[in-house]
Amino acid sequence: MFSYFNREPTDDFDSTSNERTNVEFKAINAQHLSYRETLESILGLFLSGKGNGVPHHCQTKSESAISRFLNYYNWSTRSLIRTIRSYILNLILAQRIKGRKPIVQVLLDLTTLEKVGKFPHLKDLIRVYNHKKGLHIVVMYLVIGNWRFPWSFRVYRGKGTASPSQLAQKLLHNLPSILTESFQIYVLGDTAFGTMKLINKIRNSFKFHTIVGIPKTRKLKDGRKVSELKTRGQQVYLKGLDIPVFLSWVWLKRDGKRVQRFVISTKQMKGITIARWGRRRWQIEGFFKTIKHCFSLHRFGQKTL
């Protein structure tokens, strides 16, 4: 982004040789050098890992300079995102091996960036959902080997708009074809993404496998609830689902008590394997903690977003 402005004037440029052009070039070069220094200061602030990611903690650039950098710029954000995604995709594709396709875990989750007060500039983006007020985003997170990448997100805008599971479907639809053709895709999510429509879509249209949570009240085609089943790994037919799935469960600690959570897989696995895959969904929680507590994402301003 800054390489163009760091280069020396070419012969063609010198051929214009008027003082005004030279002054303008120096001004532009100085401006973008300042941008670069500001970016380095922001990254240093974030990567220090102290959880002080807001501008007034920066010791090398003023709070106003950082605010200008984040709010007033003339480069394309979309182009920057495409560049970063291209770099990530190349890293992932480098993991390809001959023989059996490696697995890419696609983690889906909805998180809330809680906000207090009035936000006129954000209009309908700040909502109350699950007793939390803030910006609710559905995030798609990729895991392959030791690599972990946030890939994309969508904002949940509340009742009457696309639901979290519908937003997840849009995110999955936008996965690059070279990725889906080169790897086995396992989609992991909690009960918010365990809807019958989404599971059918993932398996029948996208041809991915899915391991998601379902509520204990979910019924089988024979009328029984999943909570009545006693054998892990057994094949079951859920009401409203066209394909067979395999059921298991995990035990979690909540408020000092053990709570049972049910997990289904569209791929045949042993019960203990399904449970292990189900637990992998919580890998994304580490990412959420990082972006909130180290990068201070939950403290974004109304115009920075």
Question: Where would I find each of the regions flagged by the language model?
Answer:
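Generic alpha-helical scaffold signal
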Residues: 36, 60, 64, 131-134, ...
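Non-membrane alpha-helical segments in proteins
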Residues: 37-45, 108
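Long, contiguous hydrophobic alpha-helical segments, chiefly transmembrane helices and signal peptides
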Residues: 66, 137-138, 153, 193
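Active-site-proximal, Lys/Arg-enriched surface segment
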Residues: 71-145
